[in-house]
Amino acid sequence: MCIRDRAQTLLRAMTLALGIERDFFDSRFNDPVSVLRLIHYPPRHTASSAEQQGAGAHTDYGCITLLYQDAAGGLQVRNVKGQWIDAPPIDGSFVVNLGDMMARWSNDRYLSTPHRVISPLGVDRYSMPFFAEPHPDTRIECLPGCQDAEHPAKYPVTTCAEFLLSRFADTYAYRRELEQA
């Protein structure tokens, strides 16, 4: 089973949990803009450099992320109490993070996962996140059953491309400011 099939299986499970049709996401993920990244995090050289993060705290922009991480560790997720906890690697498994687009789609019934990477002490870290995203023209609007009179839609309708591009623009706004200075 390829990684895209695993993502599709997870999306189908999520629709069942929300009480909507099982194949809701199938057509929306034809010709997707999914991305696989290969990431190297250099090691920390001293224990006191724990603040030197490999990746600062963030949430993923898209729907779901399937993350393969090597045995080095370093991934942390923020729990509901706001504490950072280790997400240790488990051989043969993937970490699943929900992203901001899925939070919008589900009207925050599913929340995006805040996470960060603390570079391991003395060893390189490698990870391979697969960001499962729909077709760029897919409308991102509140899913059926995720809104009612007491819980109206929280977000305006957008498309996958518009949403991702706006998030990238926000993330890299500092570059525009530097260029204008």
Q: What positions do the PLM features span?
A:
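C-terminal flanking tails of non-heme Fe-dependent oxygenases
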Residues: R4-A181
